[in-house]
């Protein structure tokens, strides 16, 4: 981790990248040649030549499950000045969302990204709304200029894990 990226992580929080369940990650309306791993996966998201791009219009709907319960504190999204995300809505523990029903649910939080945010400045979320997060849905509703394509260079999620017991690791005690 570079000194620059370490300084971006809010004090007392960690990058939640290692806690993402990659087998369940989905992104609706992504370009097939500019997909979500470009903005989310380690190594890819640090390469400014790679990005996630929307396909049919400016909206993106991203579903991120975690392999353990987390507390989400803040996020950082990097993107270009014109096509970078502007209105971003976050939904905690809402599965099976799609563009036809995303407006049926109130978001856990909404952020309006500024030019400074698009350079990687973290945005603090309503922490009380993200205490027991098993999955996160991110709805990028609009971009900075209203253009047809939204581009995201990096998505980073910051928070902490919740101490829980791994129920899969427990063994049944047999009666004798």
UniProtKB/Swiss-Prot annotation:
Residues 5-176 form the PITH domain. Disulfide bonds: none annotated. Keywords: Acetylation. The modification N-acetylserine is found at residue 2. SUPFAM superfamilies: Galactose-binding domain-like. GO terms for cellular component: cytosol. The keyword Acetylation applies. Signal peptide: none annotated. PANTHER family: AD039 HT014 THIOREDOXIN FAMILY TRP26, OS03G0795500 PROTEIN. Belongs to the PITHD1 family. This is PITH domain-containing protein At3g04780. It comes from Arabidopsis thaliana.
């Amino acid at each position: 981790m570079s000194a620059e990226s370490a300084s971006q992580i809010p004090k007392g929080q960690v990058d939640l990248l290692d806690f993402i369940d990659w087998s369940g990650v989905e992104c609706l309306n992504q370009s097939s040649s500019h997909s979500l791993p470009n903005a989310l996966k380690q190594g890819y998201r640090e390469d400014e030549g790679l990005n996630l791009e929307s396909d049919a219009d400016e909206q993106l709907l991203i579903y991120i499950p975690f392999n353990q319960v987390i507390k989400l504190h803040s996020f950082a999204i990097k993107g270009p000045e014109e096509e970078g995300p502007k209105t971003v809505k976050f939904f905690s523990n809402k599965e099976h969302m799609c563009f036809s029903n995303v407006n049926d649910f109130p978001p856990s939080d909404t952020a309006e990204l500024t030019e400074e945010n698009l350079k990687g400045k973290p945005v603090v979320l309503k922490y009380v709304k993200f205490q027991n997060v098993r999955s996160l849905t991110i709805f990028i509703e609009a971009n900075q200029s209203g253009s047809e394509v939204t581009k995201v260079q990096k998505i980073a999620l910051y928070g902490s894990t919740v101490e829980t017991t791994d129920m899969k690791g427990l063994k049944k005690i047999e009666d004798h």
